[in-house]
Amino acid sequence: MFIYKWPADKKNDTGIVSQHSSCNVHGGGISSYADNPSGAGQSLVECLDQALRDVPKDRHTGTPLYLGATAGMRLLNLTRPEAAANVLAAVTRTLTQYPFHFRGARILSGQDEGVFGWVTANYLLEKFIKYGWVGQWFQPRKGTLGAMDLGGASTQITFETASPAEDPANEVQLRLYGQHYRVYTHSFLCYGRDQVLQRLLAGALQTHGPHPCWPRGYSAQVQLQDVYDSPCTAAQGPLTFNSSASISLSGSSEPALCRSLVSQLFNFSSCHFSQCSFNGVFQPPVTGSFIAFSAFFYTVDFLRTVMGLPVATLQQLEVATTTLCSQTWSELQARAPGERAHLPNYCAGATFMHQLLSRGYGFDERAFSGVTFQNKAGDTAVGWALGYMLNLTNLIPADPPGLRKGTDFSSWVVLLLLFAAVLLAALVLLLRQARSAKSPGAI
């Protein structure tokens, strides 16, 4: 949950929205409550209670409240639309019990998720419009940033492009602050970090051997129902299996075999356009600078801070991934004892990220040098949520803002003239005092 704030008298302004606070909902996403819809609403109560404290009481009824659901709910809606509707109805009942101005809960499309993340990044980093010292807004000379988001069930890539997309489904045209933007965007469902980990787990089970991406010395009981319960992994499962059965699986710390297992997630052979990323999806060449956030950031941050490895180039990222995937379970625990629950999967996540960027999206060394891994801009998280809120509340106008922030130019001129007059008067007074001190009659 994110709470944003902005001055009430600057509603059509920009550069003024900031994140007031946030709250992490415990447990899984709302899609995990498909068989217990009421639990989805109950899971939000703790954060909603925090919102009651964080938002001033006299602003409760005037504060808009939105819920946007992403890839997890898109998957549920594909396979069990009735269950998805029940979950949304349950969270709606909970949200309407609070004094905020609830304005709806909906499932975002993959295109929406990608574009809203792109809007958030460029809004926060002032790529659309900047505020000058003389009280005027101006268009920055530099271009926009591309955005890459790696969520739990999907991953998105979005960037501005000069040429029309060969596949109209991958193009969005926006008009912001009087400027036109042609944006390429695509969301890959089942390529979010959580679903990738499940697909790799299913792939490891098919080999009847150890999991090459897990560290040697680590083992876990794997519930088959948990592995094959997703539409992303259903095709990898046996035709019949005991849903209550479990299998003991161990890791082997084999970087080369892990890379091979990850490569099976991508299809590079089919493309009906002039060029594709993977799975037959059109993508123009990546251009300009990019910001990579969410699980992209957390993976790189682990490699940098916990493993102490450089990742400034694609080659360094590959070497760092190989080093990580060669670690044993005891070695990893010694490095990060507080992250025991996440440690087994960092190798798989890093290997997938490297292949997605280099082979999937086509980043070479030159293009990769323009990628920044960042999860916040100031105190505000980078992600789709802020862009979604800005769109729903019309805080980004299509035309340039008519309002000026702070003191306008004419006021600056008057202040400068007054300052000059005071300074001149002070100089005249000092000169007179100096002359008086030098006169014969002076004491």
Where are the language model's segments positioned?
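Beta-propeller domains
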Residues: 8-19
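Active-site glycine-centered loops adjacent to acidic/histidine catalytic or metal-binding residues
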Residues: 151
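Helical "lid/coupling" subdomains associated with nucleotide-phosphate turnover
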Residues: 3, 22-60, 66, 72-147, ...
